[in-house]
Amino acid sequence: MLKPSDTWTWYYDNKAQSLMLDLGMDMVFCVNLPHKVLVEGAFSECKFSVDDASAYQMFVEHISYLPLSEPRKVELALNCVAAKRFHKPMLPKSWFFETQSDAGYAPEEGEVISLKNDLGEGHFIIVENYECASMCMLVDMDAFALNPTKYMAFCEPIKVMHDRMAPMQVVNSSYYAMVG
């Protein structure tokens, strides 16, 4: 698994129209966030901070059991760090999902949760936790249908109210399942 370094640098690539993370040794990671959702600080070069490294490690630990390849786990963890640090505040879009739990459910950052609707069930990681809602990111490789014409892709973020979420429990090292 890729280990964080204090030599890593965030920068915005105008030609690619994307936030990038220079990992050194001619390796560059392209963040999966569109230009329009980035805070102003994303457009200035800055170091991968101690907080970034801590968040990266936390996300890596929480996704270790997911049935993803190591490169996909790194991609997911780095996109989570980028969203946590550089994504503009967003309003919840809970109407896409069914209510699954009482209003008292409060997921933790890094927790993998389940969201359901009439079209299926998706698995998401909590990127940033707020009082009643959280920004989460799709961890499934397959697209998740929000409605018949709108789909989410791997690593795409969305903010959802906590009552739409259900906790996940590891069944074994290769699979995960909903509990509740």
Curated annotation (Swiss-Prot):
One Gene Ontology term from the biological process aspect of the record: division septum assembly
Subcellular localization: Cytoplasm
Pfam families the record matches: ZapC_C, ZapC_N
Highest taxon listed in the record's lineage: Bacteria
Single GO cellular component term: cytoplasm
Keyword line: Cell cycle, Cell division, Cytoplasm, Septation
InterPro entries hit by this protein: ZapC, ZapC_C, ZapC_N
Oligomer status and interactors: Interacts directly with FtsZ.
Its job: Contributes to the efficiency of the cell division process by stabilizing the polymeric form of the cell division protein FtsZ. Acts by promoting interactions between FtsZ protofilaments and suppressing the GTPase activity of FtsZ.
Stated family: Belongs to the ZapC family.
Protein name per UniProt: Cell division protein ZapC
Provenance organism: Aliivibrio fischeri (strain ATCC 700601 / ES114) (Vibrio fischeri)
